[in-house]
């Protein structure tokens, strides 16, 4: 093995034809060395001083260094440290096992592994056609009830792809899959937030410990089923914007990732979106405006009409957002309708952690109950929540497990819970089959009507010259929106571009009393048909309404009507 002059870029270990280049930032005046280990050994077999520098980057190249035979770390100012730019790490293959570079149990791998993508590419599903599904790689299948062979892994997700595809989803959003430290001084880091090794997929998320191949296999399998893969990348505040951009480009090019969810407080979403390499990659952010508005409307708060009308029609792409009523940071949907207060006692922080204001409503009793009237109301509210999410025109995202009533027992902050509290309980699927099937056909219904996912945001103007605005709002009187503060009901009419196409009218009654809705008069030859409602579910065939001028909605009911 021979030491030669190295290059300062790219950072990390770069395998070339006959040598490996090492480049690492080192503060000025600090001594640094490269440590080499035989694969699997915890004692360095060689040490090479890092003397050449460009700025504060030390670099060297080693001719004759076989990537299959060696692992490495750095020694900087007397401290053993891993390479933050490494593509894979040894010692992290087992979830929950504490390893560290200081005792050589954590080492960097020299990645040089060809992969056959079989012609795979990013899917580029149009933003307005996306139906997203948010999950935690481990929590999605770790529970024995998942009945997969490789629980809590990328492979577990692949085993569940038939389920995901049948549901109607075409994008999965994964919580952090990079190599984070799950064992911290204060708590278990289940979610993966905080400092991490961002360039390396998590080894413990692969059944065989090979996170690189595991993530690639999952992405390729998802793409074959027409499902995009989006990664949440909540970089810590210490990571420079330049490194964030480099990391995102790496995952897009090396792993064919379709999109990223970023923290706009740390990096400009607009600047990342303008990156020439990432120009056609979805760059997104969490925003809770839709969530807060629809939760309050769902439970019957007053004064919500203006916000509701905006979020029913607002498209997501321009703002780099997506609509959700529940997410990992808060209650599941089942808990949203079952608890008024958070119950985070198991987190060990005296119930002081997690959001205090959840805009939830327990329907009359806190937590589990056998009272049939309460259970029926909760089921109604969950269906209404899915109506609000899937019939809004922005891009919807379902929290994994909500479609079958998964519960976290009132815990709205499971960041440290790696157990049955945070894992999906798949046994609920058979118990809540009716809810699951309702969600599945509601997703199919959304896809059936392009008026529910337009390419351009509707404005209330007559764009087609038919004399009818593209979107209008109605109440007990047609063309008169009930915008009074006490109103908890709204009719929304989406007009078709041509006389031949179907019209859509959605009546939302979140009030605890019944309300009449006046129906706009259709063009000659068309009639109003019931297509779906909270009570009836999604009808296999549209049912002609006996009354064509108005419709009565029971309390807490949504009705979807089409004009044809």
Go through the PLM ranges and name each one.
Residues 1-133, 138, 159-168, 375-379, ...:
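Carbohydrate-interacting/catalytic domains
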Residues 99-101, 268-405, 413-417, 450-453, ...:
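Conserved alpha/beta catalytic core and glycan-binding cleft of carbohydrate-active enzymes
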Residues 128-147, 194, 232, 362:
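N-terminal small/glycine-rich loop or linker at the start of catalytic domains
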Residues 131-133, 172-174, 229-231, 260, ...:
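Hydrophobic faces of well-ordered beta-strands that scaffold small-molecule active sites
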Residues 138-172:
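A conserved hydrophobic secondary-structure block that centers on an alpha-helix together
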Residues 146-152, 180-224, 237-254, 346-367, ...:
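Aromatic- and acidic-residue-enriched carbohydrate-binding clefts of CAZyme catalytic domains
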Residues 165-186, 330, 340-342:
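Carboxylate/His-rich catalytic cores and anion/metal-binding grooves
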Residues 223-228, 233-288:
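Active-site neighborhood of glycoside hydrolase catalytic domains
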């Amino acid at each position: 093995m021979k030491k030669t002059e190295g290059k300062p870029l790219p950072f990390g270990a770069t395998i070339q034809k006959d040598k490996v280049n090492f480049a690492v930032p080192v503060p000025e005046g600090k001594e640094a060395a490269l440590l080499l280990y035989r694969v699997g050994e915890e004692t360095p077999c060689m040490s090479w001083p890092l003397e050449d520098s460009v700025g504060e980057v030390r670099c060297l190249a080693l001719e004759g260094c076989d990537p299959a035979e060696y692992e490495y770390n750095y020694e900087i100012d007397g401290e053993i440290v891993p390479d933050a730019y490494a593509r894979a790490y040894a010692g992290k293959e087992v979830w929950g096992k504490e390893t560290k570079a200081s005792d050589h149990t954590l080492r960097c791998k020299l990645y040089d592994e060809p992969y056959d993508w079989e012609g795979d590419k990013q899917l580029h599903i149009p933003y307005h056609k996306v139906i997203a599904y948010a999950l935690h790689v481990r929590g999605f299948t770790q529970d024995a009830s998942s009945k997969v062979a490789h629980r809590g892994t990328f492979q577990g997700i692949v085993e569940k792809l038939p389920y995901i595809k049948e549901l109607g989803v075409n994008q999965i959003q994964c919580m952090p899959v990079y190599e984070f430290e799950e064992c911290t001084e204060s708590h278990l880091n289940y979610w993966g937030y905080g400092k991490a090794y961002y360039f390396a997929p998590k080894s413990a998320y692969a059944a065989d410990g090979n996170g690189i191949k595991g993530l690639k296999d999952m992405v390729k399998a998802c793409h074959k089923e027409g499902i995009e893969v989006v990664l949440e990348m909540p970089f810590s505040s210490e990571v420079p914007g330049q490194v964030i951009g480099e990391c995102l480009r790496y995952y897009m090019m090396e792993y064919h990732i379709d999109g990223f969810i970023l923290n706009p407080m740390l990096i400009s979403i607009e600047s990342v979106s303008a990156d020439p390499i990432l120009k056609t990659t979805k760059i997104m952010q969490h925003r809770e405006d839709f969530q807060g508005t629809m939760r309050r409307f769902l439970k019957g708060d007053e004064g919500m009409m203006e916000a509701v009308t905006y979020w029913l029609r607002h498209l997501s792409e321009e703002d780099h957002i997506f609509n959700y009523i529940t997410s990992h940071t808060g209650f599941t949907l089942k808990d949203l309708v079952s608890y008024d207060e958070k119950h985070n006692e198991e987190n060990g922080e005296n119930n002081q952690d997690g959001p205090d204001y959840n805009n939830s409503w327990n329907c009359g009793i806190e937590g589990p109950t056998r009272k049939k009237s309460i259970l029926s109301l909760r089921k109604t509210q969950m269906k209404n929540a899915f109506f609000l999410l899937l019939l809004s025109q922005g891009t919807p995202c379902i929290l994994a497990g909500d479609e079958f009533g998964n519960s976290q027992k009132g815990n709205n902050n499971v960041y440290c819970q790696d157990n049955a509290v945070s894992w999906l309980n798949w046994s609920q699927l058979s118990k809540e089959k009716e809810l699951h099937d309702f969600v599945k056909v509601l997703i199919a219904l959304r896809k059936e009507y392009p008026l529910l996912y337009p390419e351009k945001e509707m404005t209330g103007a007559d764009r087609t010259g038919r004399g009818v605005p593209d979107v209008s709002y109605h109440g007990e009187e047609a063309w008169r929106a009930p915008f009074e503060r006490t109103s908890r009901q709204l009719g929304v009419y989406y007009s078709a571009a041509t006389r031949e196409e179907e019209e859509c009218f959605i009546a939302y009654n979140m009030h605890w009393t019944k309300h009449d809705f006046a129906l706009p008069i259709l063009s000659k030859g068309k009639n109003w048909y019931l297509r779906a409602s909270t009570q009836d579910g999604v009808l296999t065939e549209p049912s002609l309404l006996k009354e064509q001028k108005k419709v009565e909605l029971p309390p807490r009911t949504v009705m979807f009507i089409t004009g044809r």
